[in-house]
Amino acid sequence: MNYDFKTNCDSNNNCNSNAKNSSEIDLDNLTFEFISEINDKLYEYLSNIANICNKFDNVKNTFFIDNEDCETTIDNEPNENIKDNNTLEDNYSKVIIAIKDKTIVGFISIYLIDESTAEICGFVLPEYRNNNIGNYLMEKLSYEMEDFYISIPVAKDNKTAPNFLRTNGYYPSTTECSMVINTDNIVEKPSSFDCSIDFKKTENEDEIIFEIFKDNNNIGSCFVSIFETCGCIHNVEINEAFRGNGYSKLLLQYSLYDIKNICQNIILHVTKENVPAYNLYKKLNFITTSEIIYYNNL
């Protein structure tokens, strides 16, 4: 189907803040489509809608589609290999769009994490809000993904989404923090009065693994993915029997000091509910750059 992209926003995505109300919009022609293949033109439409909504709401939400998801082939011949290479994503929609008079006025984007979990995000053009379009989209989603646990990431400064999500039965569950440290601020060398502690470093392509040993036994590790200007710490783990003794701090100090000369910044993600880890990163001078609140319907 061919769509039009129309909005009351100008070329710089500045929108008329006086969005139309329900008495001005005839919803009789409102239809919905479930789409599993995204072409370049549809991707452009959805990107424009997301950008307009972000500017109108003064937030930076993204949606779970990139250019790699776009179907660019024009070969209509059947491919016998497609069925054999079928993936989980092939069985479900990537996006649900709301259409009025051939114009896309809103959509929900779906990212499948595994066979039972999905994340979603949604946008409705400002001039079409307050007409239950978002609620209708959520209703369509509930039928399409009824067997899935749905999680919805919302930027902490998003003032529009929380009330809408609560109306649809979604409530805050966890808060994920993005944290960063500039490597110029890493000055403390790892130190331990315990001579039984040792470290090991293993370098792979674009990744470094740091391990901590006590009495020659591995008691923990962390991974650092290396990018052009930053490193990303993840999978920090200390064996349960050795937790609460400061070994996480020693491991991280060793890792940070080792990579400080190859990265400009080091980033990580942690949930605020993981209080010991969150407090440790703050003690190591990581600062929080953004917070995402996850809503779910359980």
Indicate where each model-derived feature is located.
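Conserved donor-binding loop and adjoining core beta-sheet/short helix segment
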Residues: 54, 58-75, 84-131, 135-136, ...
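Conserved acetyl-CoA-binding loop-helix of GNAT-fold acetyltransferases
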Residues: 130-143, 244-257, 279, 283
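Glycine/small-residue-rich hydrophobic helix-like segments
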Residues: 218-261, 265
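Conserved GNAT acetyl-CoA-binding A-motif
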Residues: 145-157, 261-269
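Conserved active-site alpha-helix within GNAT-family acetyltransferase domains
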Residues: 135, 156-175, 249, 273-290
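Intrinsically disordered, low-complexity terminal tails and inter-domain linkers enriched
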Residues: 2-25, 67-91
